[in-house]
Amino acid sequence: IAINALVRFIKKDTLDIGEITASFMRSFENYLKTEPSYKGRYTGGAVATDKPKGKRAVSLYPSRIRTIHNLAKLEYNDEDLGIVRIPLSPFAKFKVAPIPKTKHRAITIEQMQQIIDLPYKEYVRGGGEPVFNLAKDVFILSFALLGMNSADFYDASVISGNIVTYQRVKTRTRRDDMAEMKVRIEPEIKKLFDKYADPTGERVFSFYCRYKNADIFNKMLNIGLKDIGKIIEVDNLQYYHARHTMATLANNKAGVDMYRVDEMLNHSDSSLKLARIYVERDFSVLWEANRKVMDLFN
C-alpha cells in the first residue's frame, strides 16, 4: 500500500534509491497529508474516495519506505570492505512521525448482548436478505472468531473439523509466518457458521459468491451496522468494533492477560521474532481464552 502511494506521488513505476533524500521524504509526507484515502487495497484496483487519508497512514507509509531503504543498505553496502553503493542516510534528518494510537472502538458487554438478541428484519420479496441481518451475523461471527477481519472471511479457504486456518490478508505479506491463524468454531456460532458456509467447498464461507470483492463485502457490512448502531445507541458502529470489543472484554471482563490478547488479535511482537522460529505456536491456548469470553454471554 505504501509503495502504491509512492508510485502515485512520483508518477512513475521506478525510482533510483539515490533520489530518496530528506527533502524528498518531506515532500512525500506533505503529499500524503493532502491525498485522499483509497479503497480496493486488497483487490489491486485501488480508487480514490472522498475521505482524507488518516494520520496513521501519513506515519505508516514513510516508515515502510524507511524500512525498505535500510534493508537495501544492508544488502548492497559492506562498510568493512569499503563498499558503499548507497551513501545517503535520509532518515538521519527526516524523522518519521510517530504512529498515532488507534482510538478505542469497543462497545460494552451489554451492547454486545443487545446485538446478539436483536431480531432479524424480514425478507423483502425479490430483494434478498436485508444487509441488517448480514451485518448482525458477521459481526457476531467476527467477535466469536477472535476478531476475524472481513477480508479474511471473504478469502479463507482452509477448514478441518471445527478449525478454520487462514493467513491474515492485512499482514501476511509482511510476516515470516504469513500471519497464520487458527480459530475454533464455538458451539454458540455453529448455526451461523453453517448458514454462511460455502456449499462448493472452494472457500470456507460463501461471501465471495455474493459480493464481487472484499471491499464491497465490508462496505455492505458497515451499511447494515449503521442501523444496528442506532438501535444500541452507538454512533457510527463499524465492523472493526467487533475486533476491539473481543479484545477489550477478554482483558477487562474475562481476565485474559494483555500478552494473550495480543496473540488473539494475531499481532506480531518484534521482540519475540527469534523465539517464534524455535517455538511452535499453540493455538489451543487462544481457544481457551476465547472460551472465557464466550462464557460472558447468554
Where are these regions (language model features)?
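Basic/aromatic-enriched alpha-helical hairpins
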Residues: 1-43, 47-49
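N-terminal DNA-binding recognition helix of tyrosine site-specific recombinases/integrases
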Residues: 5-9, 37-90, 148
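Long, amphipathic, Lys/Arg-enriched alpha-helical "connector/arm" segment
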Residues: 41-47, 92-134
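Active-site/catalytic core of tyrosine-dependent DNA strand-transfer enzymes
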Residues: 112, 186-234
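C-terminal catalytic core of tyrosine-transesterase DNA break-rejoin enzymes
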Residues: 140, 144, 148-151, 241-267
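Conserved tyrosine-mediated DNA breakage-rejoining catalytic core shared by Y-recombinases
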Residues: 154-195
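Short, polar N-cap/turn motifs at the start of nucleic acid-interacting alpha helices
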Residues: 158-165, 235-236, 255-277, 298
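Catalytic-site neighborhood detector that most strongly recognizes the C-terminal catalytic loop/helix
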Residues: 168-173, 265-295
